[in-house]
Amino acid sequence: MKAKRFLLAVMASSALAAQAQVNINIDAHNRGPKISPTHYGIFFEDINHAADGGLYAELIRNRSFEDGPKYGAPADMQGWTTEATEDATISTKLIEPTKKNPLLNSVQHHALELNIKASIDAPVFLINKGFWGINAVQGRTYRLSFWAKGKYNGTVKATLRDNEGENIYAETEVSGFPADKSWRKYTATLQSDSNDPKAQFALVFDGVGTLDIDMVSLFPPTFKNRENGMRPDLANMLYQMHPKFMRFPGGCFVEGQESPDNAFRWERTIGPVEEREGHWNVNWGYRTTDGIGFHEYLQLAEDLGAKPLYVVNVGLWHGGKTEVEDLQPWIDECLAALEYANGDVTTKYGAMRAKNGHPAPFNIEYLEIGNENNQPDPRQQSDRYYERYDKFREAIRAHYPNIKLIGNVVAWGDDNPKWESTIDVDLLDEHYYRNPAWFADAFHKYDSYPRTNPETGLPAPKIYVGEYAVTSGFGDLGNMNAALGEAVYMMGMENNSDIVPLNSYAPIFVNENDAKWRPDMIRFNSSRVMGTPSYYVQMLMPQNVGTQVLKVTQHNPYADQMLTASVTPAMSHTGFATWQTKASFEMPDHELKPEHLETISGNWKRNGDGSVSQTSMRQQCVAVLPNIVMDGKHYTLRYRARKDSGDEGFMIVFNYVDRDNYCWVNFGGWGNTQHGIEQIVGGNKMQTVTKRGKIESGRWYDVKIEVTGDNVKAWLDDDLVFDTQLKHDTTKGIFSSATLDERTGEMIVKVVNTSDEATTAAINVQNFKVRQAHVIRLAANRGTDENTLQQPTNISPVEQVLSPENDSKVLVEIPAYSLNIVRVKN
């Protein structure tokens, strides 16, 4: 044993890894839990124009003339323009319903009135540029529809054209004119003869009169040829992931903001599209048509081969709530949605589903009650969550006892959230947005999760990791370091599929023209789409999941001593910071002269008593003291700090090198609910450790920070709050796992190398005869490498046939920065 330890130490402390061999030993009879049939899924939310202008195939922007520049502003002609040739005129006006001039139906609040004076030789044009361009594809057929009424004599043509209107790619005359006083639907098809990702759509008029127009729609072919369906290239990206379930409609999209009218209300999203009112997606800054409605979500899940997982609103939205005592309408809305999805055609809503083209039930088996609504701070849309959950639970259990119910736990600022209630729940939804090192370090996170409730002896709630992604240290769009950290975490969940039966990365989509969140798994524009390295990890893992875990013994030369470099810099500075809070600071051991204070951001001033105050309510207000220089080996600093007003507490900055590299102890962060240590590395922030806690206003606190190498201790009024180690932004090493696919008789071995050194893995198997093997590999030259729309497959999977050494051993090269999936046939 001593010899083995000595050998590992020597190997780990050398530059070593390039030639070191990792031994991965697997006994096919030494089995772990069964893999859950729902283990890998997807999470869809309309963020970054993921729906309108994205997965939803509609090409016309502002098709019903209801959009405006922002929430609360009047509707305008967003997306639409007009042109007139010489000797012709066209004027437009958004009209509202009147008794004499009703609109198409009660949910339409505006239509477009056109006053036209044109001729065959001098036409006028109503133009829509779509969502940052309409993708005209040679040979592709497009379906046009719109509603119109009025007094107009002349013809109407529909065209696809270039931006200047000089080149016409498709043209057809719309039959049925002249129009009359009644609303009529007009349809036509166009076929493009050219390619142009920035094409425009135009209606061309050559007559005289007045027309009211509404609900102008243009559809390309859709995924599985569904009417009102999905953009095929984006939907196919999802299909390739083999999702076992699809969570919808969010995310914050579930709750909405400012008003309950901005929440997802399922019943207004079904039926003919002209009868859907749409609503403001205030959280993400644009209006949604609800073209992807409740029915389309269910249909998409079915088309992907995924079980639907519906998230229901519990009477909370960003900025408001329905009191617990008044929840019944929300509960009724939930039950009606379940009847629509699961009910027989003899039921009210089951019959409605059949009318909409799907007589067979969709069968929702999983329902989440609320979205991130169990935070410790009630201001974070988290009012009396357990009472809300229980009211929904009772009603749902009474009507649908077999549906699995998912509860919310603390969604941010807590690495180990708990269900703090005795109310029964089937699964708990954990959310983690962290850095690559956190995910790699969480490889064994679920090994120790209890499988039974120690007090009752009953099975413990299972875990649904509903949202997770590397959001710090991911680069620009999402790099290989991020993907590999996530891959290691996924392997850990796979090993514990008995307690973590569901998981889903978030978010999926981003239109490059409106990125509200980074990173995202799939990036697109009007004509192109690419997957980040994280997408390929999310695709490869469920494609190669197996049916039962096999226990792995790994002899790893990369082990503990691989990370010998210190995180703490050799020389650094200290300072202060606030986040949406005004605060004051003192340093008893140092005089804070005005010239000693360097403002990075915020409004900082020196007071007459020698203290320093920050008076802005902005986020991330930072000041440093360049005259105080610390030795990275060991230092101790003392402070006094006071919260003066605002949302949070105060922060002590340490290990400050520059604006993009420093640490802080955050007392009273996350809405004054948590203390934490955070590291800012290369401009990206990552959590090191968190703990429940809050800061009182108007009270001076004594703070002490002691740094010894990478160890940090922090005291608040003589109470030791933290004693922890700073972390690298990536964890270097080799990680492995294995499963058996009882359907094919294959052994599937996953090996991740997060380091910059290549190695070789020897896969040694027992009770399993090796006959053939091949490896599916995702690799990059550097951990910071990414894909782009211009180079979408810079990092993408490749396959290689392997030659087994014998019937019990396979050697496989493990490149630096790689995920390797070895499929071994018996």
Tell me the role of every PLM-derived stretch.
Residues 98-122, 571, 602-622, 673-678:
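Short carbohydrate-recognition loop motifs
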Residues 570, 578-591, 598-599, 619-621, ...:
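C-terminal beta-sandwich/jelly-roll accessory domains of carbohydrate-active enzymes
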Residues 300, 391-404, 419-420, 426-427, ...:
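Catalytic-core region of carbohydrate-active enzymes that cleave or remodel glycosidic bonds
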Residues 490, 496, 504, 519-592, ...:
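Catalytic cores of secreted or luminal carbohydrate-active enzymes
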Residues 121-240, 327:
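Extended acidic/polar, glycine-enriched regions
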Residues 42, 73, 88-113, 254-294, ...:
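Aromatic- and acidic-residue-enriched carbohydrate-binding clefts of CAZyme catalytic domains
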Residues 616-680:
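Secretory/extracellular carbohydrate-interaction modules
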Residues 186-188, 637-639, 700-707, 712-716:
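Short tryptophan-centered beta-strand motifs in secreted/extracellular beta-sheet-rich domains
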